Amino acid sequence: MPLNNPITSALLADPEIFQQNRLPFHAHFADQTSPEMLLTVSLDGEWNFRYAKNLTAPFTDWDTLTVPGFIQMQSLQKSGQPYGTPHYVNTQYPWDGHEKLRPGEIPQDYNPIGEYQRSFTLPESWASCYLRLNGADSAAAVWCNGVYIGYTEDTFTPAEFDMTAAVHPGENTLTVQVYRFSSGSWLEDQDFWRMSGLFRSVELFTKPELHLEDVFVKQDFAPDFSSATVTFDCKVSGAGTVSVVFNGQQQSAEVGEPAEYDSGVVFGKGEADPDVEEDVQDVSFTFAVTDPALWSAEQPNLYEAEIALLREGALVERTGLKVGLRKFELKDRQMLLNGQRIVFKGVNRHEWSCRTGRTVSREEMLWDVKNLKAHNVNAVRTSHYPDDPYFLQLCDEYGLYVIGETNLETHGTWQKLGADGSDEWTLPGARPEWRENVLARAEAMLERDKNHPAILIWSCGNESHGGKTLWEMSEYFRRTDPRRLVHYEGIFWNREYPATSDMESQMYPPVADIKKFLAEHPEKPFIMCEYSHAMGNSNGGITDYTEYAYEEPLYQGGFIWEYMDHGIAMTDPDGKPGFAYGGDFGDRPTDREFCVDGLVLPDRRNTPKMDAVKAAYAPLKITLTDTEAVIENRNLFTDLNAYDLVFASSVNGKPERRAVLRADCKPGETVHLLFPFALPETGLACMTVTAIQRAAKPGIPAGYEAAFGQVWHNYAAARLTLPAPQLVEMDCNIGVKGKGFEYIFGRGKGLVSIRYNGVQLLDDTVRPNFWRAPTNNDEGCAEPFAFAFWKTAGLYARCDNLTAEAKDEFVTVRANYTLPDGQTLPIDFAIDGAGRCDITMTWQGARTELPEFGLLFPLRRELTEVSYLGLGPRETTADRTAGGKMGAWSYNVRQDFAQNTPVYPQECGSRTGVYRAAVTGSGLNIGIGFAGDSMTFSALPYTPHELENARHLYELPRDDNKTVVRCAAFQRGVGGDNSWGAKPHADDCFAVEKGTSFRFTIQK
């Protein structure tokens, strides 16, 4: 079918033509029905589809694609990937290096068009027909029966069009062309995969002659919150009765007089803007509420409201709303929710599904919300665009604070290779041709989402520098919706319009820098819209930030970057499932694995980083001494008596005694509770106090563990004295053996054999180890370069001398190692008659920092079952122990690695605070034990060097070749303040100096 008014490249590139015939923005109605007719028809499902490389290229033959969905994600599933592939870049634009372009220009050679087409039958009862595109990336044009309907940019807000004049009874043909690049692409330089398509639902809808066009629910409160007034500002078309029922009250009004109404239609250059008159009237209803049940993340109370439209007493249309009553304000330089100082314990959340891209199912959204609530997260920043309305509905219902962010990021127009390179091309600045395009994005978001109580703050976008247009946007927000605050981080880069943001917002500053800034600039509250970069094995030091929020009133929390890895599900060369990241589809330029930077893996499995988040964001801080628990209630509206406080003692991980207490403690206060019984004084004695939620809340069942605190002491057990083992000294080897054990040390090699009960446990020689597989954060601050010596030091340390001495009940073998720089490292192996081997390695050189200090044991492949006494149950690091609980834990080496390792291979799997560990195998009937004083322990299928050499998990060797155990005095913290230069905090950057020693024991 021929299409009139075809779209031209000039139109796509023109920032002043960003929509044509688009209907006015309005609130999203999740529940609008009519007894007379079906108001909405979904067009989701299979569409006919064809593809062209650019505007002048021929189209392919017709195929089918699914709506909603991305063209490139579905192309991956087709032979030859005929419709292109996803392309990942961070701040650089995807055309950088391919075509020389500036704002106002778009790619000409590669600007694919996806043409969707399907037929529909107009319901007989419909007197009007409208189309709603809920999300089209990056621009779309619509035709019905070949007649041009309209054009839209702004990927993440709905575009509605009136097709009434073009439809006819019976079957109609709808055509939508989606363009990968448009002028809007310059404004959508978010850190994500670049793709195109109809990625949110497509709907037809009709309007009854009496119709609710829009509603804005507004609230005001008495100073003590003892009462509230709730106003429903409605826009209604048609004549009849409007009835609003709220809080058991009902009000009604008659409408019917026509009024001039600005349609909001924006036309392209050269087109006249006709006068549009519709029978739309404004009508308001105000209700009084006594003792209102306020909305918060802790108590997401929602009232039901119903707006009914009637004609001659008969119901024509019904709209249901859920209303949350809450007051968010800036007072005395602090942000207050319902009168209380708020601390944002948040995450940034891109919309993502590893199989469908930014087309996220309702089930995935619900999982996200419940998962965030289960980890004490109370806030989400919709980075960096308006989310699907259903996600916001869930935030209302389950209780999450939201920063609603405008679909705007122009990072690549001003930041060049990490530095501020702003110039005349920086967008939006004060460039007049971009002004309306930018401001319309803010209007579309606010109008759609204005009735969500979860949204506390409007954000002007992300990383778009500064200037007058952004200030105008902030003023629009304040003028239209004064009951919310306005956020914009970019004033940090450009202070020309500081009033753009009601708060100081920065990204990734260390706590020390925040303290310094607030000491010098205490005018506004301070949040971090991004912090604790979660790329790879990260988020070290996160608790430092949370604790500061309770020390400095002006610092009110932040949002971790980010919630989820953006890996794409794929099948690896071995036929196994895996994940792809930037560059894996040949996409260039690319920022490679920078897209896998989340707290959860691409398939929504929680990483151990989430354990630390849950602990850092806990609503209670529980600190234990040897005799009492000190509990600080960090809730805003929940008393401590909402929790059962479980006191439990254990010895060596085995439960001893248990008691349940309850206590009153108001929000913001602290209580001291004496232990109901004494802490034991034997073995590894531990007292744990756990706060268990007594009643279910939305998303959180009764019995949920909200917080815990621990104290423990390790009491050494008496050691039996046995006769010394037998020493066997020969030309090539030294042996030490006794009943059920034998150790062999090779001259020039070191410890080469451990046999317990006749079973060989080693796969290779035990070696000193100073290296860990570099993490993304290590690479970002060039630590592999700085510490390169330590990689070779462990690999090539030479055992120059081996001596043995039998004395008292021990045989001690000393292995003297020489490192490549000539430094020496003696390691003593003191073996008693029971086969216990006390190992002591002592540093002899100058003071130096290094990644790790310990020994590496390559064990037989059968040894895969680990049980240990230490922090668990999952990985902890030197700077990420929060969330680790002292106790007895167990895991399978291969399963633990498969379930928890980052998409990009790097150091992982360590356990800190370990006192004892055992590694066994099902077929050997024997294992090897390790014991130390709060050491760092890991058991992996790979050496650090094997992990380092792989860029994807499928590039690693088979996982059943061996088990690599490492016992270390320390391993350097993983850091996480950012991933491009920040080192771990000073306390977590360990060093050795002359005399530093590490002692631990191995035994059967």
What are these regions (language model features)?
Residues 2-35, 73-76, 147, 186, ...:
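Extended substrate-binding grooves/exosites of carbohydrate-active enzymes
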Residues 3-7, 12, 16-19, 33-34, ...:
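Accessory beta-strand-rich segments of carbohydrate-active enzymes
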Residues 71-74, 83-89, 180, 296, ...:
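Beta-strand/loop-rich accessory regions of lumenal/periplasmic or secreted enzymes
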Residues 82-87, 92-106, 153-155, 163, ...:
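An acidic-aromatic loop/edge-strand motif
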Residues 116-118, 157-161, 259-261, 281-287, ...:
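Short strand-edge motifs at loop-to-beta-strand transitions and within beta-strands
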Residues 127, 167-171, 289-302, 680-686:
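Short glycine/proline/serine/threonine-rich loop/turn segments at secondary-structure transition edges
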Residues 144, 227-270, 283, 305, ...:
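Beta-strand-rich binding/interaction modules
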Residues 190-211, 566, 575-624, 634-642, ...:
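Catalytic cores of secreted or luminal carbohydrate-active enzymes
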